[in-house]
């Protein structure tokens, strides 16, 4: 699997500033649009490798935060990406990795699970 980052609801300017460096690192970029939210996460990242088991579209809330999903990366590449982003102030607060657990979820489910975790953690901090 080629390393890849999926972006959802992220600022195009940020993505365009990161694009050349990510390309030099051999990391691809995909923008996840509204029409892909009900596709499985694995299929959205790697359609040639994963089967799609889409959910029926629904009125599930669409989170409004910027999100990036790191796919097919080892620890070294992930750290390089995160360090580059931090040094260059390309902040995307919500990040996750493609895992064996979430690869079969719909993208919208992943976003809403992460959003629920964020809210729960914020409550615990208070």
Predicted stretch roles:
Residues 1-48:
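N-terminal, charge-rich interaction modules
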Residues 45-51, 69-76, 107-116:
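Noncatalytic linker/hinge segments flanking ATPase motor cores
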Residues 24, 28-30, 34-35, 52, ...:
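Phosphate-end processing signature that detects enzymes handling 5′-triphosphorylated RNA
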Residues 37-69:
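Short, intrinsically disordered low-complexity segments
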Residues 3, 14-17, 78, 82-125:
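Helix-rich interaction surfaces within compact, conserved domain-sized segments
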Residues 58-88:
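Mid-chain, well-packed structural core segment of small domains
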């Amino acid at each position: 699997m080629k390393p890849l980052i999926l972006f959802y609801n992220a600022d195009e300017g940020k993505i365009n500033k990161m694009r050349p460096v990510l390309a030099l690192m051999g990391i691809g970029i995909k923008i996840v649009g509204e029409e892909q939210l009900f596709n499985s996460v694995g299929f959205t990242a790697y359609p040639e490798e994963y089967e799609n088991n889409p959910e029926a579209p629904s009125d599930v809330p669409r989170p409004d935060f910027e999100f990036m999903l790191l796919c097919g990366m080892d620890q070294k590449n992930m750290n390089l990406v995160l360090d580059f982003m931090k040094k260059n102030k390309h902040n995307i607060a919500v990040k996750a990795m493609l895992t064996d657990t979430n690869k079969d979820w719909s993208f919208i489910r992943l976003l809403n699970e992460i959003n629920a975790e964020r809210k729960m953690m914020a409550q615990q901090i208070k």
